[in-house]
Amino acid sequence: MKLVIDTNVYTDYAAGVPETVDFMATHGETIFLPAVVIGELHFGFVKGKRQTFNEKKLKQFIDLLSVDVILVDADVARKYATIYLSLVNKGAKIPINDVWIAASCMEVGGTLLTRDKHFAVVDQIETVILE
């Protein structure tokens, strides 16, 4: 399965949460990390007390697991517009960064792994919501 990792899932993985680590090991044939997630993580690192440690851990995660980073390009931007319009039309709201994450997921045809239940309103992607 192509797994696209949300910010909260990376945080769980880095903390060694067994459910998350096991799910990724069992189902993650290919692991993708949207650039938007990397931005959210770096924001947390910068405002935290262990910036260098956390940045090194993220780099190791990307390098050791051969994680593919999904960049925001014109194709992702078009998918963002499609998803956002669909959400507006049905009166659903999710954080803007999460629309970008969903668009990134749609771009690679992956399944989003997250703890955020609001992704269930995004019809264009498959989502696994960890409890």
Stretches with model-predicted labels:
Residues 1, 102, 106-131:
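Acidic, PIN/NYN-like endoribonuclease modules and their adjacent C-terminal/linker elements
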Residues 1-34, 45-60:
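Short, well-structured N-terminal submotif of metal-dependent ribonuclease cores
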Residues 6-7, 41, 80, 105:
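Generic structural signal for small/hydrophobic residues in well-ordered secondary structure
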Residues 10, 38-41, 119:
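A generic structural signal for short hydrophobic patches within well-formed alpha-helices
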Residues 47-52, 87-88, 129-131:
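Short, hinge-like loop/turn segments at secondary-structure boundaries
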Residues 68-113:
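Active-site neighborhoods of divalent-metal-dependent phosphate/nucleic-acid chemistry enzymes
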